[in-house]
Amino acid sequence: MALTAYLPYAVTIGTSFLRSQVIEYPMSLVRLAHELPIEAPRTAWLDSIIKGDCVSALERLSDHSVDVIFADPPYNLQLGGDLHRPDQSMVSAVDDHWDQFESFQAYDAFTRAWLLACRRVLKPNGTIWVIGSYHNIFRVGTQLQDLGFWLLNDIVWRKTNPMPNFRGRRFQNAHETLIWASRDQKGKGYTFNYEAMKAANDDVQMRSDWLFPICTGSERLKDENGDKVHPTQKPEALLARIMMASSKPGDVILDPFFGSGTTGAVAKRLGRHFVGIEREQPYIDAATARINAVEPLGKAELTVMTGKRAEPRVAFTSVMEAGLLRPGTVLCDERRRFAAIVRADGTLTANGEAGSIHRIGARVQGFDACNGWTFWHFEENGVLKPIDALRKIIREQMAAAGA
């Protein structure tokens, strides 16, 4: 099944690859929280649904064990009664017991507890996505910042087919808000597949407003009576974009409010691991059947375009240590206007000054900055080649070694 079957954009195949792997899923996806030890090893819960309360179930996961979190917490809608259409038919709204809290203070305490537990299990370079409506997302955002998470973006999910405002007393509520945050301000190494998102968006930067329909049709899970299995089932395309943007094949995706299993189904299809937490048995049953029916995509279909920033860093000394350049080699720019000599310590010298390939490249041109990898060239069989070609050789060796 092609990724475009439920993505509104195509995955662009690039020449730089993120390693993929074949993931084996357990025959039984369900684990009981109380039967797992505190901070259980990864093998005890990976690619499974943990049945239990969100916070207590999170205690079963070890520190820094997940790469990305997607959380769709209770909205705390405060409906105050049934909703009816103009024809007096009742609107299927969220009125389940799990969405009811006695006060804002109780909701804030609940939010703080699960966010603290999530922060413990999130890797230092991991990120968290939280989705909500105007009823709860601002309260959740406050807790995120108070606990030290660092906000990266807020994303507006614009719904192509939102529910009307039947009473005509407010604007039609046509969007939900996602908050994307790193574990803390120091979390600089988080995954963001910028080039893949740009390529998927007709080579234009992906914006922070996303247009998707709400979950309908054959994707919407129904019970034997034709009723919705879960009132807030999210579209697979939304989860797919999140995972394609902020994770790599083989990463672990945590969903502490698993519901009908959209996160697990998309993770399996996209070659990611998952762990879900859910306490309601009907949702667990639906999610289990759904995930078991998913066929993962192949490695070629999961190739993600990456850019220079996503590639492993290579020091200039590594080029010398590999024997690709020797001390005393003369480098020049592509027009042979400037020259510098390679020294044994990995620096260059030119005009009586020594420094890095970048610093000396800038100095000889009278610039403040320079990319030495593309500026400096070496000569091979009478042909000038950028030293970046040597860096590429090192990166290929690193990839072959699994680095």
From Swiss-Prot:
InterPro entries for the chain: DNA_methylase_N4/N6, DNA_methylase_N6_adenine_CS, RAMA, RM_Methyltransferase, SAM-dependent_MTases_sf
Chemical reaction(s) catalysed: a 2'-deoxyadenosine in DNA + S-adenosyl-L-methionine = an N(6)-methyl-2'-deoxyadenosine in DNA + S-adenosyl-L-homocysteine + H(+)
EC numbers for this chain: 2.1.1.72
GO MF annotation, one: site-specific DNA-methyltransferase (adenine-specific) activity
The RAMA domain, residue ranges: 297-399
GO cellular component, one term: cytoplasm
GO BP term (any one): DNA replication
Signal peptide feature range: none
UniProtKB keywords: DNA replication, DNA-binding, Methyltransferase, S-adenosyl-L-methionine, Transferase
Protein purpose: A beta subtype methylase that recognizes the double-stranded sequence 5'-GANTC-3' and methylates A-2 on both strands. CcrM-mediated methylation has important cellular functions. Contributes to the accurate cell-cycle control of DNA replication and cellular morphology.
Name of the protein in its database record: DNA methyltransferase CcrM
Species annotation: Brucella melitensis biotype 1 (strain ATCC 23456 / CCUG 17765 / NCTC 10094 / 16M)
